[in-house]
Amino acid sequence: TLFRSTDIENKTAYEYWNAFTNQWIKGNENEATVLIEDKVGELSFIYNETHKKWIIAYFNADRYNITMRTAEDITGPWSEPYELANGREYAQLYGSYIHPLSVTGDNLYFTMSMWMPYNVFLMKAELADMGEF
């Protein structure tokens, strides 16, 4: 969904991506298509100006991890999933909200929540360690 911040309460101004027509469709949510073929929860995204890429992070319950993908355009194509954190190392993890400090530089900062202890942690991933980033 795309909209200006001044239009947040005006749903008729919202635009929805449609991959079949390869364009944004204004005011018709039913025309929206899926951007990422994956189980996505607690999604956040940011444009990293240093690397000129969109970064999307989300919780995937099936893989029990926090996943990251990148794309040169917000509409894709999106990279294969990259695991930022997993439930084997961080039991009962969820959430994956990207911190605004990630807009530039070689680090991705994101918050990760855990049920036990019930808390939120600031995490850091080095983008250079992610291969073809």
Walk through the language-model features, giving the residues of each.
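Loop/turn-rich, solvent-exposed surfaces of beta-rich toroidal or solenoidal domains
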Residues: 36-75
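Hydrophobic beta-strand positions in blades of beta-propellers and related beta-sheet-rich domains
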Residues: 14, 66-71, 120-124
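Surface loop/turn motifs at the tips and blade-to-blade linkers of beta-strand repeat domains
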Residues: 34-39, 84-90, 112-113
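Conserved blade-ending motifs and adjacent loop-strand segments that build the rim/top face
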Residues: 75-103
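Blade-level signature of beta-propeller repeat domains, shared across WD40, Kelch, NHL, RCC1
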Residues: 98-133
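Signature of short aromatic-glycine-proline-rich micro-motifs recurring in repeat-based ectodomains
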Residues: 31-45, 94-103
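Beta-propeller fold detector
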Residues: 9-31, 79-85
